[in-house]
Regions:
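...captures the hydrophobic TM-helix bundle architecture rather than a specific catalytic motif
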Residues: 1-172
Length: 172
């Protein structure tokens, strides 16, 4: 048994869904990162919703894996800020023009791979099954995984023909 926290559950659930819309529609990297991390925090809260030891452990695992990806995302924003690039359209227009752009695209791809629960980050997704059924279905079937895949696809012009692109292709 656990205490009734349905209001928090649905508020977090809808924040998660809203953040997914933000990821799809954001062009600015800082806004994209903002929505990206809302999905991380929301998934942590939703996986740990039941407040059992198992759900808390799996929520922390999901949080740590996704925060590693978020760190890569933040580092990419810093690198791209030095190059004067602050949105995905400008990043894609650069292609693989410089090592800095390719490195930043690689860090963003790392974030996408972590969010998509690709090897070696797949461990958190299995543990997410302790969450209530709508959450585990949402995390497994569509949103978190597809958010990572979506970001990697948007970066494909920057990774094409590079060693980083080959590494991403091998992993994902």
């Amino acid at each position: 048994e656990f205490r009734d926290r349905r209001r928090m559950f649905f508020a977090t659930f809808f924040a998660f869904l809203g953040a997914m819309y933000g990821i799809v529609f954001a062009n600015n990297l800082v806004w994209l990162y903002f929505f990206w991390e809302i999905t991380t925090l929301s998934s942590f809260l939703l996986i740990g919703y039941k407040e059992t030891d198992e759900s808390k452990t799996n929520a922390m695992r999901a949080l740590s894996m996704n925060l590693m990806g978020g760190l890569g995302f933040a580092l990419a924003i810093v690198l791209l800020g030095h190059a004067g690039i602050d949105n995905l359209a400008d990043l894609r227009a650069q292609g693989a023009a410089s090592q800095l752009v390719v490195a930043a695209a690689g860090l963003l791809a790392f974030a996408g791979i972590a969010k998509a629960a690709q090897f070696p980050f797949a461990g958190w997704l299995r543990g997410a099954m302790v969450a209530p059924t709508p959450v585990s279905a949402l995390l497994h079937s569509s949103t978190m995984v597809k958010a990572g895949v979506y970001l990697v696809l948007r970066l494909s012009p920057n990774l094409e023909g590079t060693k980083v692109g080959m590494a991403v292709a091998l992993v994902g």
